[in-house]
């Protein structure tokens, strides 16, 4: 099955990010709706932003989070390297065309431990990135 994966890392400037996503949507529309497309990445725009709304209101792409039959998302995706940070803000997204169904969606919150200096048997939790990874189990219809 032919498929297209588009990765994005949007700017922090809200006007530019909305415009860049409109350009991406135009390119996807040029494919004529015939090819399955997955658009994923760090959009630096949460689920309430103009950028996000531009994408989901286009009816070209849907949010895997919203489509998932089973969802594991105890926090948002941006953690600022703080393992104790909790948020509902998702700035990392997986969008897909109607060629796909989403079985499961998850925000993976695994941390690792490092020894605390000058303290025996003491460890500190760390995040490997300032964003938690997002994963989806999808099926081509």
Question: Which stretches of residues belong to each language-model region?
Answer:
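Glycine-rich phosphate-binding "P-loop"
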Residues: 8-14
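Metal-dependent phosphoester-hydrolase catalytic domains
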Residues: 15-38, 43-141
């Amino acid at each position: 099955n032919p498929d297209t994966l588009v990765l994005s890392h949007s700017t922090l400037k809200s006007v530019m990010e909305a415009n860049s996503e409109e350009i991406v949507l135009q390119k996807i529309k040029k494919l004529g709706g015939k090819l399955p497309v997955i658009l994923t990445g760090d959009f630096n725009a949460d689920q309430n932003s103009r950028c996000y709304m531009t994408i989901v209101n286009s009816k070209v792409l849907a949010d895997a989070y919203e489509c998932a039959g089973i969802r594991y998302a105890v926090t948002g995706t941006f953690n600022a390297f703080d393992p104790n940070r909790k948020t509902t803000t998702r700035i990392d997204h997986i969008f897909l065309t109607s060629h796909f169904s989403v079985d499961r969606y998850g925000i993976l919150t695994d941390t690792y431990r490092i020894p605390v200096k000058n303290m025996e048997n003491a460890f500190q939790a760390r995040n490997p990135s300032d964003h938690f990874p997002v994963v989806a189990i999808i099926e081509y219809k």
